Amino acid sequence: MGIMIKKRNGRKEVLDITKIQKMTIESTLGLDGVSQSELELDAQIKFIDGMSSSDIQDALIKTAVEKIDIDVPNWTFVAARLFVFDLYHRVGKATHGIKGEPYCHLKDYLKYGKDAGRLIPNLGEGYDLDDLNSYIDPSRDFLFNYLGIKTLYDRYLIKNNKAEPIELPQHMFMAIAMFLAQDEK
């Protein structure tokens, strides 16, 4: 029997290494000087029986961060991708109930943010939200390095009253643009 983990929903199950492999493959894809197997093996040293799936994600991120070096700078993008995957999971679960789904429609984001009291009530009025939503491209989130996405998360992304993130980078940038241009004719 393998390592038992506690899922985010409280359920316990045996650690499925194929899920970790999928995550590590996606996080290293197309980046020079980084190794999926190295990330996976080094992170597994930190896995202990009873840890949560959230702790496993944190271990993967920390392992990638520890590997950032002037000689292998792409580890910062691995750490950033892992962080973004976790952010997608957390925001999706909190806002539209679909864990891991990158972005809900802009209308849904605005409604949730307003209902949570985190966005101004008239934000989005007078805009073609379907058109603006078509400009959201989740692949842009992977242009951040780790320090960039971590700073954005810590300082700027909106969180609910439980301190859970409810906003993703492109929704934030779109909301800022809509707010700044709202009085333009």
Model regions and ranges:
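Extended catalytic cores of very large enzyme megasubunits
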Residues: 1-185
